[in-house]
Amino acid sequence: MSRIQSTFAALAAQGKKGLIPFMTAGDPDPARTVEFMHALAKGGADVIELGVPFSDPMADGPVIQQSSERALAKGVSLRHVLADVKRFRESDDKTPVVLMGYANPIERMGADAFAAAAKDAGVDGVLVVDYPPEESANFAETMKAAGIDPIFLLAPTSTDERIAEVGKIASGYVYYVSLKGVTGAANLDVLSIAGKIPAIKSRVPLPVGVGFGIRDAQSARAVAEVSDAVVIGSRIVQLLEEAAPQSAAGKLTNFIKEIRQALDSIGATAG
């Protein structure tokens, strides 16, 4: 069982919801990425999604696009991100880490070389935004052979055929994009999310994490009521951008603690 699978199994056994924060590797300060990853884990993150900076992040809204640009301007590459994960693993062998990014940096390295390097670094999952599932069976197998979960996106516009395709090749969890648009958008529709999850669950035997548009404890709790996990990205990137350097890690931990408490209150209020 992979680290991601055992994390979700433990959450399910406790009746808890998963909390998956996203941050861009190298932003705001490449020297502090590992420190911020530990701050997320300390706050109660179940899985950490680490964004690999890319020059044309088409699925991302302005907050994460600009974050990616800042990291690239500081020279952060896929190899730097893998080195950060390896350093994180020196003192945390429990929290799963998922790399989220685009195909180009992986293809430049080569899928086999990337799988080997990611395994060596202690990466648990990979989500390549621009790999459609119907063209990704070989990539998924290469990742699985290295013990890495290939994670895929589904959206409100995903057909039953695409959902079934993801069900065949994905592992770990699936990431449901709750809005038609880009990350960080504001209009969250929990009813439409609740309406789509059963169609995914019937075809994909994996936990469903929902992201895009979750900004605070209230929206996180509302989405977690109808899903297995919530993914929060733009708000975290914004928080790190705005915080004074000396208080950034503490603010990050406190923000994650707030979300964690909101998720853990689901079901608790019934008694």
UniProtKB/Swiss-Prot annotation:
Transmembrane region(s): none
SUPFAM superfamilies documented for this protein:
Ribulose-phoshate binding barrel (SSF51366)
Instruction: Supply the EC number(s).
Output: 4.2.1.20
Record field: catalytic activity: (1S,2R)-1-C-(indol-3-yl)glycerol 3-phosphate + L-serine = D-glyceraldehyde 3-phosphate + L-tryptophan + H2O
Subunit architecture: Tetramer of two alpha and two beta chains.
What organism does the record attribute this protein to? Paraburkholderia phymatum (strain DSM 17167 / CIP 108236 / LMG 21445 / STM815)
State the protein's name.
Tryptophan synthase alpha chain
**Catalytic residue positions:** E49 (proton acceptor), D60 (proton acceptor)
Similarity annotation: Belongs to the TrpA family.
Per the record, the domain of life is Bacteria
